[in-house]
């Protein structure tokens, strides 16, 4: 940073204009910007593997579709100390809609349970397309209360963008 500032300080244009230099750190150094909570809709076995289908998509969690598993926690209606291995997948028809792979999940996981994925953020809000699903709501937890920052998108929102 010092070498950049020294160079800028010696440049006549920078002296006259005095622009602000903003350095955007990106995902790699961002802490837990958001946590994403999604509902489990289906637990199914295919060719000896367990798949948990959620109401979200990989775009809501990691729109760059990287293969790293983010930190996660399950909230099951039944407590169970036994675990099983599963893949957490999204609700689209795309083969690449894989959110987490080969993860330990409660053996009692079922429809209606929830998963929280941490470390989500930075680019997820701007890179999440409205492909098959609407934009998710954004909820802030403050002093134990849920505050809606952005409501869930609906069909009226999408149609209102068109002059039809």
Predicted features by range, described:
Residues 3, 9-164:
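Charged (often Lys/Glu-rich) extended helix/loop segments that serve as interaction or gating elements
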């Amino acid at each position: 940073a010092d070498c950049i500032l020294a160079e800028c300080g010696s440049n006549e244009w920078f002296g006259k204009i005095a622009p602000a230099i903003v350095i955007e750190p990106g995902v790699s150094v961002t802490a837990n910007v958001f946590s994403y909570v999604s509902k489990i809709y289906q637990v199914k076995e295919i060719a000896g593997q367990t798949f948990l289908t959620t109401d979200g998509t990989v775009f809501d969690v990691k729109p760059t579709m990287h293969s790293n598993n983010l930190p996660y926690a399950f909230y099951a209606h039944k407590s169970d100390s036994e675990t099983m291995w599963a893949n957490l997948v999204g609700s689209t028809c795309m083969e690449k809609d894989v959110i987490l792979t080969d993860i330990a999940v409660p053996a009692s996981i079922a429809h209606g349970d929830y998963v929280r994925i941490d470390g989500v953020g930075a680019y997820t809000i701007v890179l999440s397309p409205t492909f098959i699903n609407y934009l998710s709501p954004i909820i802030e937890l403050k002093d134990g209360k849920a505050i809606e920052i952005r409501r869930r998108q609906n069909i009226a929102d999408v149609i209102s963008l068109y002059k039809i």
